[in-house]
């Protein structure tokens, strides 16, 4: 009888967790946890990337060499000495060795489970008749990792084992680094001085958390604080220290520190030993002692887990669906709102989020905590420049500075004000926000409404003689940095996005009784659309832009970068594209950009530098913005299809492709668990099929707020307006029904959607048929049971 192989990827605990049962099939598959001060992403094999805020991002476990400070990178490369969390198990009688979760020994295992949960990460590894269980959790308010390690004897004989947790600390500082065992704290404490050269930086760095601690609840039998002493000549797969009777009790003196502790145990058949550890940064020993007292006990771990579960529950979202696609249900109900919550809760753990990211990430909070979205508008608009322009980044803490890409001038940030406000108003109906007076650093004190008008005026002024929007050194596409660096280049996408934004704002002006302003902004939108049609329509799609030297690009004649998705999506949203133009565009999009893994941002990819477009053309073929399945661009297209109507099959197909699975083949190709949407999957499907579909593994993306919005307002068709809730579901043709529970303005809507013999959507509230698919006069606290029949 052959043993049935476990399913590679599976949901458990009613979808609250996802498991993977093989550490080699998807080696980069990972889970992530966060609180408002830290984040950690950890792979199924045990490699980890963690950072915390003080207030700028910092590390407490480092690479083994000097590490560049940078933003989170896609497609991380893992290697033997990459930071990670491991435990070695050695049979003291036979000398055999394995490690959990899988690295660094990579020994064969009898059972492997990596379980990514919403509130913790968990492993079960069985090898050599021994079971190891590892659990990692976080506190709600502090920077620390809480680890539980259980070791059980599954064999039929007593076992003598050494259990050696190994948490490498890495190269901390070229100025000063050390580590030693601290008897008072019962753990290893590594210390460093953050490198600096300017005198002023001494005071800036004085109170940084320059210590990393690894604390044990049970005193170990021996320890190692020096990486070289632990690893020796054996290498990490068979460290020299584990070939000795005990660890040597080393320290590290301007040497690379590590944290390895060893327990010698004897386990009878079925016996188990449990250990708890605390790993994190601190400023001094007093802080470490306080963390130990608060957390490092069984009761402390249990209370922390309960508190963290309550913290995560606050991000549960406003939607629950039952559809024919159970994997999609699981993602929508459990994992999508979690990722949306992450973005709005911590703003990607940066002190200067890009303005467009900040506004779009907080757009998702409309469906979780609308007050957070409201506050974000006030924070952002207070930093408006005197010209009406928005800055490239929003500063969130005192002393923060614009860094990285925010030092490069982009021209699109004003566009996102009305675009994201529309979702806020749809969800809350809170037009009082517009009357809030907001002072700025310029000394003026204007209402939100007045500031938005200034932003729209800035967009209208920032156009050339043709009426096309200047691009400077980038628009939404950050690396399109050389189209307009001489001051003349224009963006086709931004011209259309400006029209869309102006039209949204004109509706708001109408609502506020400002009909003259509404007329002016609509005329501006019409002018942008007309300019796009005159100068950018290429017969079957809209061009991406015109360079400083007056070269139109993103057209049929281009061998690379021929057709871009964003201009087509936003021409639908802005109204620039007529029905006839849309009929021409959609087949071209299908032909040029569709892949089995979603829709490419453009195609074909660039294979060499194009100096009048910029560094986007230098990116690796099919990666990031160079013709990847860039999900943010994809969701704009999906949103435009739902707004257009009668495109639900095309929209749903693309929406579903954003999620890995459900086949093992798809999971393996993407290499990612279906617990988040990454910023991209590799594109260039025709040119580089071997790598196409590979996940970036980067969960920071503006995609997810839009995905949640598209599911709520598009697929489910439950969109708010000034009077109540509009009901216009857009089910794919393969579905005959779905059920939705939607929380909206304090009320609960239970919606049963079914196909029937009707020509238009009909809604029954209890026994009453509504005159239109529109629920008005909604009462908070009430439950509405709606039966919806669709054609």
From Swiss-Prot:
- The kind of enzyme this is, by top-level EC class, is transferase
Question: Among its keywords, does the record have Glycosyltransferase?
Answer: yes
Give, as in the UniProt entry, the pathway in which the protein acts: Glycan metabolism; cellulose degradation
The reaction(s) annotated as catalysed by this protein in its Swiss-Prot or TrEMBL entry are: 4-O-beta-D-glucopyranosyl-D-gluconate + phosphate = D-gluconate + alpha-D-glucose 1-phosphate
Offer an example of a GO molecular function term for this protein: carbohydrate binding
SUBUNIT field: Homodimer.
Q: According to its UniProt record, which protein family does this protein belong to?
A: Belongs to the glycosyl hydrolase 94 family. Cellobionic acid phosphorylase subfamily.
Protein name, as recorded: Cellobionic acid phosphorylase
The organism encoding this protein is Neurospora crassa (strain ATCC 24698 / 74-OR23-1A / CBS 708.71 / DSM 1257 / FGSC 987)
């Amino acid at each position: 009888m052959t043993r049935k192989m476990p399913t590679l990827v599976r949901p458990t605990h009613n979808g609250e967790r996802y498991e993977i049962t093989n550490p080699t099939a998807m080696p980069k598959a990972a889970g992530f946890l966060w609180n408002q001060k830290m984040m950690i992403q950890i792979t199924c094999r045990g490699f980890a990337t963690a950072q915390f805020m003080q207030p700028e991002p910092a590390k407490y476990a480092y690479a083994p060499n000097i590490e560049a400070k940078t933003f989170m990178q896609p497609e991380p490369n893992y290697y033997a000495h990459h930071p990670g969390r491991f435990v070695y198990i050695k049979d003291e009688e036979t000398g055999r060795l394995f490690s959990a979760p899988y690295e660094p020994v990579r020994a064969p295992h009898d059972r492997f489970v990596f379980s990514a949960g919403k509130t913790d990460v968990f492993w079960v590894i069985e090898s050599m008749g021994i079971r190891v269980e590892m659990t990692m959790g976080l506190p709600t308010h502090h920077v620390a990792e809480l680890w539980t390690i259980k070791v059980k004897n599954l064999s039929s004989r007593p076992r003598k084992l050494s259990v050696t947790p190994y948490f490498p600390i890495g190269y901390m500082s070229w100025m000063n680094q050390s580590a030693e065992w601290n008897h008072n704290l019962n753990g290893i404490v590594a210390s460093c001085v953050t490198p600096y050269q300017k005198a002023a930086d001494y005071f800036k760095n004085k109170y940084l958390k320059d210590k990393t601690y690894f604390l044990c609840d049970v005193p170990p039998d021996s320890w190692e604080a020096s990486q070289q002493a632990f690893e020796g000549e054996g290498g990490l797969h068979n460290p020299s220290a584990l070939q000795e009777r005990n660890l040597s009790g080393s320290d590290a003196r301007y040497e690379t520190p590590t944290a390895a502790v060893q327990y010698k145990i004897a386990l009878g058949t079925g016996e188990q030993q449990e250990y708890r550890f605390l790993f994190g940064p601190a400023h001094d020993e007093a802080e470490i002692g306080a963390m130990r007292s608060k957390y490092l006990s069984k009761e402390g771990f249990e209370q922390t887990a309960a508190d963290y579960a309550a913290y995560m529950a606050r991000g549960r979202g406003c939607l629950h669906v039952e559809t024919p696609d159970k994997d999609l249900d699981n993602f929508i109900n459990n994992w999508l709102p979690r990722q949306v919550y992450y973005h709005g809760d911590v703003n990607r753990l940066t002190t200067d989020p890009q303005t467009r990211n900040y506004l779009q990430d907080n757009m998702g909070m409309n469906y979780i905590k609308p007050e957070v979205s409201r506050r974000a508008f006030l924070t952002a608009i207070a930093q408006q420049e005197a010209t009406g322009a928005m800055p490239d980044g929003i500063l969130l803490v005192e002393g923060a500075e614009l860094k990285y890409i925010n030092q490069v001038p982009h021209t699109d940030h004003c566009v996102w004000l009305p675009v994201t406000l529309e979702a806020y108003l749809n969800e809350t109906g809170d037009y009082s926000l517009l009357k809030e007076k907001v002072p700025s650093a310029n000394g003026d004190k204007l209402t939100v409404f007045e500031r938005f008008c200034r932003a729209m005026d800035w967009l209208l002024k920032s156009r050339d003689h043709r009426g096309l929007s200047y691009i400077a050194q980038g628009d939404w596409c950050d690396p399109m940095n050389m189209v307009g660096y001489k001051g003349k280049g224009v963006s086709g996408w931004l011209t259309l996005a400006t029209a869309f934004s102006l039209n949204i704002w004109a509706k708001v002006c109408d609502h506020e009784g400002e009909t003259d302003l509404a007329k002016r902004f609509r005329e501006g939108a019409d002018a942008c659309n007309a300019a796009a049609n005159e100068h950018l329509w290429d017969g079957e799609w809209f061009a991406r832009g015109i360079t400083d030297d007056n070269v139109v690009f993103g057209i049929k004649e281009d061998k690379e970068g021929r057709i871009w998705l964003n201009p087509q999506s936003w021409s639908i949203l802005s109204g620039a594209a007529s029905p006839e133009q849309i009929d021409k565009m959609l087949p071209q999009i299908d032909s040029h950009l569709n892949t089995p893994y979603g829709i490419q941002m453009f195609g074909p990819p660039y294979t060499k530098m194009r100096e009048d477009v910029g560094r986007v053309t230098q990116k690796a073929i099919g990666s990031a913005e160079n013709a990847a399945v860039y999900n943010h661009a994809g969701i704009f297209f999906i949103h435009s299809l739902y707004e257009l109507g009668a495109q639900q099959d095309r929209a749903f197909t693309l929406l579903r492709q954003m999620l890995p699975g459900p086949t093992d083949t798809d999971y393996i190709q993407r290499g990612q668990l279906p617990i988040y949407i990454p910023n991209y999957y590799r594109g260039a499907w025709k040119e580089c099929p071997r790598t196409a579909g590979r996940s970036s593994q980067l969960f920071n993306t503006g995609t997810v707020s839009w995905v949640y919005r598209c599911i709520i307002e598009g697929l489910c068709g439950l969109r708010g307006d000034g009077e109540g809730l509009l009901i216009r579901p857009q089910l794919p043709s393969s579905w005959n029904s779905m059920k939705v529970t939607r929380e909206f303005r304090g009320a609960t809507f239970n919606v049963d959607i079914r196909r029937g013999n009707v020509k238009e959507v009909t809604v029954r509230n209890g026994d009453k048929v509504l005159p239109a698919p529109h629920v008005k006069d909604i009462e908070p606290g009430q439950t509405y049971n709606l039966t919806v029949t669709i054609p």
